[in-house]
Every structure is written in C-alpha cells, then in structure tokens.
Regions:
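HTH-adjacent hinge/linker in prokaryotic transcriptional regulators
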Residues: 1-88, 94-106, 110, 117-122
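Conserved phosphate- and dinucleotide-binding cores of soluble alpha/beta proteins
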Residues: 4-9, 16, 31, 64, ...
Length: 240
C-alpha cells in the first residue's frame, strides 16, 4: 500500500488470482463501506471531502506543502504577473515566495494579500466580493468580475481532490466558479497539491486534468495515477 492506496494488480499478483476476481471482491467490500474504489486501486480513506478551515488544513501535511512551495518558486519569472488562489498550500507558497524583479500578484485571499504586501517588489491586486471565514478569502460574482481585465502568466491553485474521473475538485461550488474565472485570466494553471489529495473528490468541479498544465506534488502519489495524469498531457513535478 502506498499513500493509502493499494493497486488491483498488486493484490492479484500477491494472491495469485485474476484482476477481475479482485475487482469483484473490491466492489463487495465497497458496498459494505469497508473501502473506496478508484481507477485500478482502492483506499480505506473516504474520497469525498468537506469544507474545513484554512487553519486546520495548514496543519495537515505541512512538510510536504513546504517542499511543494519551494519547488513552485522556480516557475516564477522576473517581472511576472501571477494569480494566487486561496488555500493552505498556496499560502505556504506565498510565505516562501521571494521573487526577482517586480511581480504583480492578483489574489482573492486576504491572508496572501497581507503576506505579499510586505514585500517591496510585489504589487498586490486583491479581488472584492463576499468574505468566507473558512478560507479567509472572497468569492462570488464581484470577485469573478474583477478578473475580466486581468491577464497573467500563471495561476497557482490548491484543491481538495484530484481524481481521474472527476478531475480537479474543491469543497464548494463557489470556490470552483472563482477558480474557473481565474483560469480564464491566466495562460497556465499550476496545481499545488500534496499526495493525500489524489483519489479524493470535492463537490465543486474545477475542471478535468487536461484543463491544467502542471501539478506539483510529493513522492506519495500512486504510480498508476501519476502515469495516467502524465498521459493526459499534464506535467508533474515531484518533490521529496
């Protein structure tokens, strides 16, 4: 088992039975609520996520998030213009960010805006809208409208789930809508997600795998998922 996942092929090989037999048994176990099936694997972790506070998220997989944040810095160019979404991993990126040259940063996050405003070579543009306590960021039609006159090189987002069938998801529809608007305002979308997000699903759908360009994650990502994501044309950067 790797990162909470076990592959159907591995079980079949260990037990000396066919993959079809294992898949049948997994369907029975899933119906009993013992596990959850994904493409080619199974997990004891419930795949559906709920909206929790950014403070709670920040305490989860903190070491992996810091490593992801350091790797994400290498994509920043001098005099760049970027969008930073809300979320604990993107906040970790903002904390680590030390750009060369003047950088324009657009964000819906009050926390990230405050962090970026402390840097002399960063100009911050904060979106307006309804403030959500869990994320300490704004969402809604005013935030979406504020992106119509923006053109950036990259958008950095977190997510609550990455699944082959459902794509990139988050906990709420409101967050998904704003993320879609941010994607339209950027040339590239970079997903910052620790490996615990793979095989999970949120209620709000951001997009399919082919809608994003780069995923930065840690080495806990299951090999089967990594291969299929790369087959979809997504670049994956793995950090230790």
């Amino acid at each position: 088992m790797k990162n909470g996942f076990i592959r159907v092929l591995d079980i079949a090989e260990q037990l000396g039975v066919t993959g079809a037999t294992i898949r049948k048994d997994l369907r029975i176990l899933e119906s009993q609520g013992v596990l959850y099936r994904t493409h080619g694997s199974a997990s004891p972790v419930k795949p559906h996520v709920t909206d929790i506070s950014i403070d709670e998220k920040a305490s989860q997989h903190a070491i992996e998030k810091q490593a992801i944040a350091r790797a994400a810095q290498t994509l920043i160019k001098p005099d760049d213009a970027i969008i930073l979404a809300s979320g604990s991993t993107v906040t970790a990126f903002a904390e680590a960010l030390s750009p060369v040259g003047m950088v324009n940063v657009v964000t819906p996050s009050l926390g990230i805006a405050t962090l970026m405003n402390r840097r002399n070579n960063v100009k911050v543009f904060i979106l307006g809208g309804a403030l959500y306590n869990n994320s300490f960021s704004v969402r809604g039609e005013y935030a979406e409208a504020g992106l119509k006159n923006v053109s950036c090189s990259k958008l950095y987002i977190g997510c609550d789930g990455i699944d082959l069938a459902s794509g990139i998801t988050c906990a709420t529809i409101e967050e998904a809508r704003l993320t879609n608007a941010m994607m339209s305002a950027a040339s590239q979308t970079v997903v910052l997600a620790d490996s615990s997000k793979f095989g999970r699903r949120g209620f709000g759908k951001i997009g399919m795998l082919e809608d994003i360009d780069i995923i930065i994650t840690d080495s806990g990502i299951p090999d089967t998922l990594r291969e299929k994501i790369e087959d979809a044309g997504v670049q994956i950067i793995i950090v230790d």
